[in-house]
C-alpha cells in the first residue's frame, strides 16, 4: 500500500452488539456498506470507538475479517491493534495483519508512563513484527502519556512502515512540529473532529473520525473541501455540524455516537461494561440535534 493512501476521511468504526452482547455481524456489514456509499477513504474497526478493550482477540480478528470481506476491496481496511505491554501489542498487530488489516492503528502504551525512549522501543518492536503500515495513535487524554513530536519523527525516519500518526490532541504547537518535520510520504491525521478544518488548513492529511459514523458523507466533503482549498465550503460544513461534533463527546466516546446510530436505525443501543447508556439529559440533547440536522 502506498503511504500516500493513508489520508483523507477515515472512520473510527463502532462495534454493534446484540442485546446478549455478542457482536452484531449483520449491523456491522450494514455500517460498512454505509461507508462505501458515502465514499469514506479508510475504515478502522477495533479502536477506541470500537470498544476494543472489551473485545476478545477472536472477536477482533472476526470483526476485521468481516469488515474486509464486506468492503470488497473498495476501501482501505485498517484495524486498532495495540495495548500497553509491548509483547502483547506485537501479537495483536500480527493477528490483525493475519486477519486482513491493511494498516495497524497502534495506541501509545498507557498507564505504564514510559519515557520517550520506552515509547520508541515499543513501536520499534511493533514495526519490526509486521509489514503493513503502522499509524502511531497519540491520545494522551486517555493514555496518560504524550508521544512527543520528536519521537514520532524519529520513528518515521527509522522505520519505513511507520507511515502515519493519529494526533488526538489540540496541541497545535506539537501538530505544527509534526507537519514541519515529517519525512516525505508520512501522513499526519487528526483524531479531533472539531479541529478538522484548522488542522487541515495547517497542512494535515485528514482525520480518523468519530462523527464519520453518523455523517460519513459530510466528513468526507469537509476533508475534501479543505484539501482542494475551498475554505468557504469547508467553513459552511463545519458550521452546520459543529454542535454534533461536540455532542459526540458529551459523555464517554463511543456512548453518544452509538446512541445516535441507534436513533438513526443502524444498530441496537448496547454497550459492554464498564460503558453504560447515555443519560436521559444527554439523550435529549442528541435527539434535538439529530432532528435539526434531519438525521432522524
UniProtKB/Swiss-Prot annotation:
It catalyses: L-aspartate 4-semialdehyde + pyruvate = (2S,4S)-4-hydroxy-2,3,4,5-tetrahydrodipicolinate + H2O + H(+). Pathway: Amino-acid biosynthesis; L-lysine biosynthesis via DAP pathway; (S)-tetrahydrodipicolinate from L-aspartate: step 3/4. The record marks 48, 111 as: Part of a proton relay during catalysis. Pfam families: DHDPS. Keywords: Amino-acid biosynthesis, Cytoplasm, Diaminopimelate biosynthesis, Lyase, Lysine biosynthesis, Schiff base. One of its GO terms (biological process) is diaminopimelate biosynthetic process. The active site is at residues 137, 166. It is an enzyme of class 4 (lyase). Catalyzes the condensation of (S)-aspartate-beta-semialdehyde [(S)-ASA] and pyruvate to 4-hydroxy-tetrahydrodipicolinate (HTPA). Belongs to the DapA family. This is 4-hydroxy-tetrahydrodipicolinate synthase. It comes from Chlorobium luteolum (strain DSM 273 / BCRC 81028 / 2530) (Pelodictyon luteolum).
Amino acid at each position: 500500500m502506498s503511504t500516500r493512501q493513508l489520508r483523507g476521511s477515515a472512520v473510527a468504526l463502532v462495534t454493534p452488539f446484540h442485546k446478549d452482547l455478542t457482536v452484531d455481524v449483520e449491523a456491522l456489514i450494514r455500517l460498512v456498506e454505509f461507508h462505501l456509499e458515502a465514499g469514506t477513504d479508510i475504515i478502522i474497526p477495533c479502536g477506541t470507538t470500537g470498544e476494543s478493550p472489551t473485545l476478545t482477540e477472536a472477536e477482533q480478528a472476526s470483526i476485521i475479517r468481516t469488515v474486509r470481506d464486506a468492503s470488497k476491496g473498495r476501501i482501505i481496511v485498517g484495524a486498532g491493534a495495540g495495548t500497553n505491554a509491548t509483547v502483547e501489542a506485537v501479537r495483536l498487530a500480527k493477528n490483525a495483519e493475519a486477519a486482513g488489516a491493511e494498516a495497524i492503528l497502534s495506541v501509545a502504551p498507557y498507564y505504564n508512563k514510559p519515557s520517550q525512549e520506552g515509547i520508541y522501543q515499543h513501536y520499534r518492536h511493533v514495526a519490526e513484527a509486521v509489514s503493513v503500515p503502522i499509524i502511531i495513535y497519540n491520545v494522551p487524554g486517555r493514555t496518560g502519556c504524550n508521544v512527543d513530536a520528536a519521537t514520532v519523527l524519529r520513528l518515521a525516519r527509522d522505520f519505513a512502515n511507520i507511515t502515519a500518526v493519529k494526533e488526538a490532541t489540540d496541541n497545535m504547537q506539537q501538530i505544527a512540529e509534526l507537519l514541519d518535520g515529517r519525512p516525505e510520504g508520512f501522513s499526519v491525521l487528526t483524531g479531533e473532529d472539531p479541529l478538522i478544518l484548522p488542522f487541515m488548513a495547517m497542512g494535515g492529511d485528514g482525520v480518523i473520525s468519530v462523527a464519520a459514523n453518523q455523517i460519513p458523507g459530510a466528513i468526507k466533503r469537509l476533508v475534501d473541501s479543505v484539501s482542494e482549498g475551498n475554505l468557504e465550503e469547508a467553513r459552511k460544513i463545519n458550521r452546520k455540524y459543529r454542535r454534533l461534533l461536540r455532542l459526540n463527546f458529551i459523555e464517554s466516546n463511543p456512548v453518544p455516537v452509538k446512541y445516535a446510530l441507534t436513533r438513526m436505525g443502524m444498530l441496537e443501543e448496547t454497550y459492554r461494561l464498564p460503558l453504560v447508556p447515555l443519560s436521559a439529559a444527554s439523550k435529549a440533547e442528541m435527539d434535538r440535534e439529530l432532528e435539526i440536522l434531519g438525521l432522524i
